[in-house]
Amino acid sequence: MINEIQNDAQERMGKSVDALKNQLVKIRTGRAHPSLLDTIYVEYYGANTPLKQLANVVAEDSRTLAITVFDRELTPKIEKAIMMSDLGLNPMSAGTVIRVPLPPLTEERRRDLVKIVRKEAEQGRVAIRNIRRDANADLKALLKDKEISEDDDRRAQDEIQKLTDVAVKNIEAVLEVKEKELMEV
């Protein structure tokens, strides 16, 4: 019973940290990274298809992404999808290869992005604390129904607090790496 609650809390906390990582990948740093275009979908035979299924995206250098399109007819559609995205990118095509130069980030924009990243991290911390609260509520319910002793309840709450501390440390580490990445010129 207690182990199930702890395992569930640990799994949910891990998912929260992973969700934060996925959220932060979408925030553009000064460096070219293929995952930057993961959120772009292209109209293909009447369905919105992820760009990575229609083309190969690689970082040509630190400031340029190269997109090799599998079907030449899709090149203009892919260019349009990139321009319509809110990433502020301006693709240039050369046959089946589309080059996407990344403009350098201004100091002000970097600071804005750091604020956004910190806000995302805080939302991650709140999610972790909510998971802890839910797990503790489940333990209290077991205690109230006399399914576990007060000692077991206390030990389990301590264990859940340790899981919470580890998850929050993971979030802090992810935040620190992303902030450093953003402020690097």
UniProtKB/Swiss-Prot annotation:
Keyword Protein biosynthesis listed: yes
GO cellular component terms listed in the entry, alphabetical order: cytosol
Places the protein is found: Cytoplasm
InterPro entries given in the database record: Ribosome_recyc_fac, Ribosome_recyc_fac_dom, RRF_sf
GO molecular function, one term: ribosomal large subunit binding
Entry function: Responsible for the release of ribosomes from messenger RNA at the termination of protein biosynthesis. May increase the efficiency of translation by recycling ribosomes from one round of translation to another.
Record-linked NCBIfam families: frr (TIGR00496)
Family: Belongs to the RRF family.
Name of the protein in its database record: Ribosome-recycling factor
